């Protein structure tokens, strides 16, 4: 990784934040009162992800399920999130968030004791633009007064994180965890510059 990296931007879900409990709760609520089992839903979701289709909406359509609310209060930071962020700040990196999130991202970051680490928060609901639209990345770069080549994007999604970063010239690092671990590149744009399996490995790249 070039020594000119100044800014490190992070996705939230399945990158810094563990959404497992919230995901499980939504599935249970959606299938309640139907003959769809949680196992069947999860198997179909993985099947569609492996085929290159994003999860949730495809499975909901397949099983004719109604989307239920997402419970952000069930989300928690991964154990490796805070130690990694602390070390990056110690090394002098500027940190930011670029994430597709419901309203209230700053409040949730404060509840998770993560807000203190970030200089810029680009959240889709507040900005009115969502990944993979390059505009949300361009907004973050403008706020940071940073050239793309001096920035890194860390995320789990090939389509929402890696592809737009690559197209803009931002260094891309894929974190293989959560459902994103099952994604396969659908185009050359989605191939990350680096791939890591745990967040602490980021420290060896920077």
Regions inferred by a protein language model and the residue ranges of each:
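N-terminal helical cap/lid subdomain that shapes the substrate entry/recognition surface
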Residues: 2-91, 106-107
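Asp-based, Mg2+/Mn2+-dependent phosphohydrolase catalytic module
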Residues: 1-8, 18, 36, 76, ...
């Amino acid at each position: 990784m070039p020594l000119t990296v100044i800014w490190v931007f992070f996705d939230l879900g399945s990158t810094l934040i563990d959404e497992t409990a919230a995901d499980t709760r939504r599935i249970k609520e959606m299938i309640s009162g139907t003959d769809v089992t949680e196992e069947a839903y999860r198997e179909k979701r993985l099947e569609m992800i492996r085929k290159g289709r994003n999860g949730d909406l495809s499975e909901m359509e397949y099983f004719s399920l109604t989307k239920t609310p997402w419970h952000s209060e069930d989300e928690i930071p991964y154990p490796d999130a805070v130690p990694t962020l602390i070390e990056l700040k110690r090394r002098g990196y500027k940190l930011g968030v670029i994430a597709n999130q419901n309203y209230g991202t700053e409040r949730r970051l404060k509840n998770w004791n993560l807000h203190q680490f970030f200089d810029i928060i680009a959240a889709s609901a507040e900005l009115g633009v969502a990944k993979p639209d390059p505009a949300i990345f361009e907004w973050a770069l403008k706020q940071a007064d940073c050239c793309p080549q001096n920035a890194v994007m860390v995320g789990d999604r090939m389509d929402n994180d890696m592809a737009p970063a690559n197209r803009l010239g931002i260094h891309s690092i894929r974190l293989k965890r959560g459902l994103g671990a099952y994604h396969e590149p659908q185009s050359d744009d989605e191939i990350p510059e680096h791939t890591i399996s745990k967040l602490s490995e980021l420290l060896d790249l920077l």
